[in-house]
Amino acid sequence: MNTVVRNAIVSDSFDDLRSKQVRFLEEAHKIGFVNVLLWSDALIESITGRLPKFPQEERLYYLQSLRYVDRIRVISNINDPHSLPLPVWDELNPVGWVVDQASDNPQKRLFCASVGMGYQVIPETDLLGFPFRRNDALEAPSGRKKVIVTGCYDWLHSGHVRFFEEVAGLGDLFVVVGSDANVHLLKGASHPMFSQDERRYMVQAIRFVRAALISTGKGWMDAEPEIELIRPDIYAVNEDGDKPEKRRFCVEHGLEYVVLKRLPRAGLPRRESAILRGF
């Protein structure tokens, strides 16, 4: 039951957001404007019998940062995950519920048929891989300063998003994600948890990021080849990423070096990837 949908309705908790969910949102965005019905903390507890891993405000902030999400409404008034609150969005027309193949079931199809709503299933095969988001960021300068940040981003979280948001205020943000080989070299045998392509994909999905690349160098300055390519004006780090090698490189190459405090967005908890790996 696939029908024409220009406004895609997506309903989920989006608790502990991972790449597969982001891939789903990207594919939904190809169908139409993505309108997320985000489950409240109380609704998650009602449906699953447990509190969410991540609180509502943090889940909302993360979703708002994704370039594939157009609007979000927090909901708490459905009896089960196989229905939507009515009216869904009065001003949206035509509208349809978009689900992935694993979430498709007769109850959802019946609900949509009963209220005259479109319904579309995204096949699992469409969610495979981590597409590279091509853009003209390197060839077509915007007139703003270029800012580069580097890191592993092995478990992207709200703290990273806040860092990207702050840095993007300084200029066009380019993120260089550490290669698998270099992360392994710097952090040890159990790193990284996620592949370089998956980590780059998650970073490039953040709307504050103009472009994301994978490093091709080695050591703390593994992004040196990418810096030569991008030619940034500013190298930004947080307190944890402040290294003598980076300071020296910026002095030698005439880059402004900016160190930001490692602070979460107001009202959100401080997050660390090392802790989340065991969350």
Task: Name each region found by the language model.
Residues 1-279:
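Nucleotidyltransferase catalytic core that binds NTPs
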